[in-house]
């Protein structure tokens, strides 16, 4: 069923893109160029007939594939076979009660007047031709509401949808115009008239201008779509969606290279001296035909990938399985190496683009020099980049399924006591009862290096073990949520130990993050995370029995809090003292709490 849906999407997108391209080539490229070259518009009568039949074929394919797409969606939603989805009314429900059905009806309502335009006698560049172009473009643009862009909420969704819409239109103006351009070149070759060389040059230059504008829009729209649907390197290389997106980008780059050869090497030949040999003109036209066919094949590959991508969850909504044994942690670098890497990255990009352009133009010596510059940038960049290389695992970029909150920490404490204390010890310092008999001492889970690893790294070790089996994996013992609970407890306890080592002086170093927790003050309930959304918070955590002397000191410091912006409300333990920023809490924590500390923006900033 999924393959059927993908095939229907591919055919429908292809038909809509190519249908727009037929009218765009007529109205924006062929006839304006013919008029400018001084040739008689009637000389393209044969091309007009062929383009008309081509438009009918694409319109029929759009209608047929759209109907199949509707049935496939109805079958997928209802869980029925294709025939049953059609005969038992599932398709009618999708058509009348879903957004997909509304968009489908819009496209097919546009197909009717478009067919009427094809039936009418169209003059080159006349009003009917322009009307047909607008109708076909509207059909193509409406497909944006059938993609992921329509599901993004808010203003971001408006931006995403607009980018998707422009992306589709640009595809119609570039990829869609390739088959008509090929037909035009075939017509030029068929005539055998050298006077057509000027017409071919005018059409090709105008087509190149349209292609450059379309590619610019495609690049901008593609960047926006990638940001919303992948957005991160792990999502690009570690998910099925991201890897398919990279395939699409690779095919697109190949199209750009072929187009660059046409623009920089072949088009100038057509616009050369008037006494250029006939063989040179026809040889150039033949090469343009071949390259246009290659571009078309690559473009259809891009559309095929789009057909699959629309059936997959975006990379940002999928757990990425990191495929490499290492990763880059740029945060480990100081400012100087970061600036150097940024400069080298820009230089490498410029060298790469210039080298491709020089190769396409046939300037191979210049391309070799630029390739050497690219290699030099990469070699020099390796030196400052080495400290940022870290060991990585398939789960390195996993997001925890359990929130980093007090409830999860408490559950993890019980699991840790049952499964981990024997080796790591009750305090987590690697001094459990069995530690002395092990050839490698268990890791100290309270040291600062714990925070150098991502939660996904910890998840891999807890799941699959480490040190060649000395630490066993817990895949068959704890379910994924339980493993995340254990990790949250380990992180919380290490944060508490680290907070206890902080002196009275403020530092610029990153402080460990405090887990979220719920609180109640009178009739008001909330969480630390919710409160932090309203501004900085001064948080004091303690365990029973309450540190009475310390609480008195804090009460005496109320004037300092007032000076910092807090309201002058005094409270008792367990209540907020200060209604405005910075808020101060005196909050009893669970039995596996941090040491007493202050929290600013979610992190311990100074021991109390």
Regions found by a protein language model. Name each.
Residues 488-518:
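N-proximal helix/coil linker or "cap" segments that precede and/or mark the start of modular domains
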Residues 392-415:
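Electrostatic cytochrome c docking/interface patches
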Residues 430-434, 546-561:
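Typically the conserved alpha-helix immediately C-terminal to a functionally engaged Cys/Sec
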Residues 1-384:
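Polytopic transmembrane helical bundles with strong interfacial aromatic enrichment
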Residues 406-407, 417-440, 465-473, 493-498:
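Periplasmic/extracellular electron-transfer cofactor-ligation site
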Residues 295, 528-555:
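Short active-site neighborhood of thiol/selenol oxidoreductases, capturing the structured segment around
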Residues 568-571, 579-607:
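Short, internal strand/loop/helix patches
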Residues 437-495:
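Extracytoplasmic electron-transfer domains, predominantly the class I c-type cytochrome c fold
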């Amino acid at each position: 069923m999924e393959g059927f849906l993908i095939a229907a999407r591919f055919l429908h997108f292809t038909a809509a893109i190519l249908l727009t391209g037929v009218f765009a080539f007529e109205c924006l490229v062929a006839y304006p160029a013919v008029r400018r070259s001084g040739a008689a518009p009637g000389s393209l009568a044969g091309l007009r007939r062929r383009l008309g039949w081509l438009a009918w074929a694409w319109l029929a394919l759009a209608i047929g594939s759209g109907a199949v797409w509707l049935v496939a969606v109805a079958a997928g939603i209802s869980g029925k076979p294709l025939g049953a989805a059609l005969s038992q009314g599932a398709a009618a429900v999708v058509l009348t009660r879903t957004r997909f059905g509304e968009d489908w009806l819009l496209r097919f309502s546009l197909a009717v007047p478009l067919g009427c335009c094809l039936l009418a006698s169209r003059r080159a560049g006349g009003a009917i031709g322009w009307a047909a172009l607008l109708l076909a473009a509207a059909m193509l643009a409406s497909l944006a509401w059938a993609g992921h862009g329509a599901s993004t909420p808010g203003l971001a969704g408006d931006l995403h949808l607009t980018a998707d819409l422009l992306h589709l239109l640009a595809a119609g103006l570039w990829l869609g115009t390739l088959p008509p351009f090929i037909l035009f070149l075939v017509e030029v070759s068929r005539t055998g008239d050298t006077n057509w060389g000027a017409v071919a040059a005018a059409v090709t230059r105008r087509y190149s201008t349209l292609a450059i504008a379309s590619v610019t829009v495609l690049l901008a729209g593609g960047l926006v779509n990638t940001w919303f649907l992948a957005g991160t390197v792990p999502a690009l290389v570690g998910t099925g969606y991201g890897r398919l997106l990279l395939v699409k980008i690779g095919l697109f780059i190949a199209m750009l290279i072929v187009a660059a050869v046409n623009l920089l090497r072949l088009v100038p030949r057509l616009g050369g001296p008037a006494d250029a040999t006939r063989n040179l003109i026809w040889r150039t036209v033949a090469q343009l035909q071949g390259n246009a066919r290659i571009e078309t094949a690559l473009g259809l590959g891009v559309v095929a990938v789009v057909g699959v991508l629309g059936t997959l969850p975006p990379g940002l909504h999928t757990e990425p399985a990191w495929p490499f044994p290492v990763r880059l942690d740029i945060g480990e670098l100081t400012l100087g190496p970061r600036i150097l890497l940024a400069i080298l990255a820009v230089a490498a990009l410029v060298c790469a683009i210039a080298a491709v352009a020089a190769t396409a133009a046939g300037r191979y010596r210049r391309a070799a020099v630029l390739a050497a510059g690219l290699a030099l940038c990469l070699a020099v960049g390796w030196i400052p980049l080495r400290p940022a290389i870290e060991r990585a695992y398939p789960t390195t970029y996993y997001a925890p399924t359990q929130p980093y909150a007090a409830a999860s920490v408490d559950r993890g404490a019980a699991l840790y006591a049952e499964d981990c204390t024997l080796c790591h010890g009750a305090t987590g310092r690697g001094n459990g009862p069995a530690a002395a008999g092990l050839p490698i001492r268990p890791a100290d889970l309270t040291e600062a290096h714990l925070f150098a690893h991502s939660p996904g790294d910890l998840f891999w070790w807890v799941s699959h073990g480490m040190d060649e089996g000395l630490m066993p994996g817990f895949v068959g013992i704890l379910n994924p949520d339980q493993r995340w609970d254990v990790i949250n407890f380990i992180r919380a306890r290490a944060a508490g130990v680290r907070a206890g080592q902080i002196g009275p002086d403020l530092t610029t170093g990153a402080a460990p993050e405090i887990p979220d927790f719920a609180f109640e003050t009178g009739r008001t309930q909330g969480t630390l995370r919710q409160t932090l959304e309203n501004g900085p918070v001064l948080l004091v955590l303690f365990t029973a029995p309450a540190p009475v002397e310390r609480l008195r000191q804090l009460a005496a410091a109320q004037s300092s809090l007032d000076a910092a912006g807090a309201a002058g409300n005094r409270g008792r333990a367990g209540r907020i003292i200060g209604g405005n920023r910075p808020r101060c809490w005196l909050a009893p924590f669970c039995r596996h709490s941090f040491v007493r500390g202050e929290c600013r923006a979610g992190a311990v900033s100074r021991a109390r």
